């Protein structure tokens, strides 16, 4: 997406805190502000969704619960209708069904982001299993 110049007037305290945080994260104030706006709007639009992780690896999650991609990955593994899968996952995890639905709604609005996380995790699992197999072969 192309960047456009936009002007904001910030109070001294907001400006100071923005610049201090950006410096701690090693990014520009503009990059931090953009991330905060996107994440802030997402959390306003999707009740129960928060962002966690380091600045370079932010991911959507349920407040006090798993990451959204983890919920979607598990729902895919389950069988049944959407509501049956939600009920099963809620019973397995003690995550309220409404929060599972919130995660699913977020994922529907951000499919590329969630799919990327799922694929990356599946790749890491495959690589880990292969490395374990190779270690066992060395010791056989």
Regions found by a protein language model. Give the residues of each.
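Short, Lys/Arg-enriched anionic-surface-contact patches
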Residues: 1, 49-69
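Short, basic interhelical loop/turn and adjoining N-cap
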Residues: 27-28, 90-102
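Helix-turn-helix DNA-binding helix
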Residues: 32-33, 100, 114
């Amino acid at each position: 997406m192309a960047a456009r110049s936009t002007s904001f007037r910030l109070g001294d305290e907001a400006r100071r805190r923005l610049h201090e945080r950006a410096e701690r994260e090693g990014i520009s104030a503009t990059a931090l502000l953009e991330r905060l706006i996107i994440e802030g709007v997402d959390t306003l639009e999707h009740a129960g969704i928060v962002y966690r992780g380091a600045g370079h690896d932010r991911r959507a999650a349920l407040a006090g619960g798993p990451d959204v991609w983890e919920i979607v990955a598990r729902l895919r593994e389950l069988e049944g209708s959407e509501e049956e899968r939600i009920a099963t996952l809620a019973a397995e995890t003690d995550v309220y069904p409404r929060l599972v639905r919130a995660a699913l709604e977020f994922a529907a609005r951000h499919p590329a982001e969630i799919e990327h996380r799922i694929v990356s995790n599946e790749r890491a699992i495959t690589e880990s299993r292969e490395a374990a197999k190779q270690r066992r072969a060395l010791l056989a």
